[in-house]
C-alpha cells in the first residue's frame, strides 16, 4: 500500500486572518463554524487595540486572555506598592496578598540591586593561539567599539553602554573555540535587541578587520564567527530581598506554636537545599509570583526563568533559590536571584495594560 505523505502548506503567513481561519476550520474542524465563533469572541471590539495585539506576533488569529489582578500592601523598602499580576493559576494572587499583609506590620520586605551587568558573546573559531587573538582584539578595540556608535548613542545618554570586552579561551572544551564576552549596562531597558544589535555590528567589524590583519595573513590564521548573541545567563545582574520578624510574631499560623512553626519552616527550606525533588517544586512556587509580574510589565519571563533556574544550579547541583534562617530569636527569609528586566522597550511602549502596570508600580 502506497503511503500518502502529508501535504505541506506554502505561504500560510501571507494569508489574511479570515483565510487562516478558513484553513483551520476546513483542515482540522470539518468546516465547523464553532471555531470561528470562539476566535471572534476573543477579539477586541476596539480595532486599534486589536491591531496592536496583532502586531506582537506572527500568524495571529485571535487573543488568548489571562486574568489581570492586583495584590496590595507590598511594603518594600518602606514604600507601599500595589503589584499588578497576570496569571491563570488559582491561589497565586491570594497567597501573595496574604504574604504581603502578614509582613506589612513587621517591616515589610527589604530589597536591593547588587549588580546589573548583562552579557553577550561573539562565539568564534580561531586556528591560532589565544595571545595572537588577544593582540588582535587589543590592537583593534577602538575600531570594534566604534562600530557600535550609532547603536549605543542613546543608551550612553541614559548612562548605559558597553563596559568591557574579554577574550575567553574555550579550546579545552571544543577545538579552536573562543568567546568574546562583552559586558553591557542597558539602563532601564531589558536590552535584548540593543545587545544583539551591538554584537552583530562588532562581529562584522571583527570579520572585516581580521581579513586585513597582516599577522593573520602571514601566519595563516583566520577568525570564523559562528554566532553573536546575548546570554540569558545573568549571574552579575543580581537582586537580593529579605523579610524578618521576631519568632514570637509568628502567631495564628496553621494552629502551631510560633517556635515550632519557625523550626518546621526552616527545615522545609533546608530540604529544598539538598533534595532536587523538593527544590524544583519550591522554586516553581517562587516563579509563580515572579512570572506574574513579569508578564504584567511586558518583560520576557522565559528569559528570566532560564537565567534564574541556571542560577539555582550555581553550586553544581540544583537547589532552592531562597533560604530561611533563625538567629537570635529572629525568623528570616531571603532570596538572591539574577533579574534582568526593563521598563522601556519591547511591548512596554505598545501594550496599554503594560503601561498601566508600570503606572501602578510608579504611583
Residue ranges with predicted function:
Residues 197-207, 214-349:
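Glycine-rich anion/phosphate-binding loop at the beta-strand->alpha-helix junction
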Residues 106-142, 312-363:
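A structural-propensity feature for long, helix-poor, extended segments
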Residues 67-95, 186-195, 273-298:
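Conserved phosphate/anionic-ligand binding catalytic regions in large, soluble enzymes, centered on
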Residues 85, 92-112, 361-363:
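Mobile "lid/hinge" segments at catalytic clefts and subdomain interfaces of large enzymes
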Residues 77, 86, 183-185, 228-230, ...:
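Generic beta-strand/beta-sheet core signal
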Residues 43-47, 60, 85-86, 127-130, ...:
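Hydrophobic alpha-helical scaffolding
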Residues 104-114, 121-249, 254, 258-261:
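Signature of multi-pass transmembrane helix bundles
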Residues 2-81, 85, 89, 109, ...:
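Acidic/polar, glycine-rich intrinsically disordered N-terminal extensions of enzymes
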Amino acid at each position: 500500500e502506497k503511503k500518502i505523505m502529508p501535504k505541506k502548506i506554502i505561504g500560510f503567513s501571507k494569508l489574511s486572518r479570515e483565510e487562516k481561519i478558513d484553513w483551520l476550520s476546513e483542515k482540522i474542524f470539518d468546516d465547523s463554524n464553532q471555531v470561528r465563533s470562539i476566535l471572534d469572541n476573543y477579539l477586541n471590539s476596539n480595532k486599534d487595540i486589536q491591531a496592536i495585539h496583532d502586531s506582537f506576533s506572527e500568524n495571529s488569529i485571535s487573543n488568548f486572555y489571562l486574568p489581570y489582578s492586583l495584590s496590595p500592601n507590598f511594603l518594600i523598602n518602606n514604600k507601599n506598592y500595589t503589584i499588578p499580576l497576570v496569571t491563570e493559576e488559582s491561589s497565586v494572587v491570594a497567597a501573595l496578598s496574604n504574604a504581603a499583609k502578614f509582613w506589612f506590620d513587621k517591616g515589610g520586605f527589604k530589597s536591593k540591586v547588587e549588580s546589573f551587568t548583562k552579557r553577550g558573546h561573539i562565539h568564534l573559531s580561531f586556528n591560532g593561539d589565544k595571545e595572537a587573538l588577544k593582540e588582535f582584539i587589543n590592537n583593534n578595540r577602538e575600531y570594534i567599539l566604534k562600530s557600535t556608535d550609532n547603536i549605543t548613542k542613546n543608551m550612553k545618554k541614559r548612562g548605559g553602554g558597553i563596559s568591557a570586552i574579554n577574550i575567553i579561551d574555550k579550546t579545552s572544551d571544543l577545538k579552536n573555540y573562543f568567546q568574546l564576552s562583552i559586558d553591557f549596562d542597558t539602563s532601564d531597558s531589558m536590552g535584548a535587541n540593543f545587545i544583539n544589535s551591538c554584537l552583530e555590528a562588532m562581529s562584522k567589524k571583527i570579520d572585516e578587520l581580521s581579513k586585513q590583519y597582516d599577522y593573520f595573513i602571514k601566519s595563516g590564521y583566520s577568525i570564523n564567527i559562528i554566532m553573536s548573541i546575548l546570554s540569558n545567563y545573568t549571574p552579575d545582574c543580581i537582586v537580593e530581598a529579605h523579610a524578618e520578624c521576631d519568632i514570637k510574631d509568628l502567631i495564628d499560623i496553621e494552629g502551631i506554636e510560633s517556635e515550632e512553626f519557625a523550626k518546621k519552616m526552616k527545615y522545609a527550606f533546608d530540604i529544598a537545599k539538598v533534595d532536587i525533588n523538593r527544590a524544583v517544586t519550591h522554586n516553581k512556587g517562587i516563579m509563580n509570583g515572579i512570572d506574574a509580574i513579569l508578564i504584567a510589565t511586558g518583560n520576557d519571563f522565559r528569559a528570566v526563568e532560564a537565567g534564574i533556574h541556571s542560577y539555582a544550579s550555581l553550586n553544581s547541583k540544583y537547589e532552592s533559590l531562597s533560604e530561611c534562617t533563625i538567629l537570635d530569636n529572629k525568623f528570616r527569609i531571603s532570596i538572591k536571584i539574577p533579574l534582568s528586566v526593563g521598563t522601556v522597550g519591547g511591548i512596554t511602549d505598545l501594550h496599554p495594560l503594560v503601561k498601566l502596570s508600570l503606572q501602578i508600580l510608579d504611583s
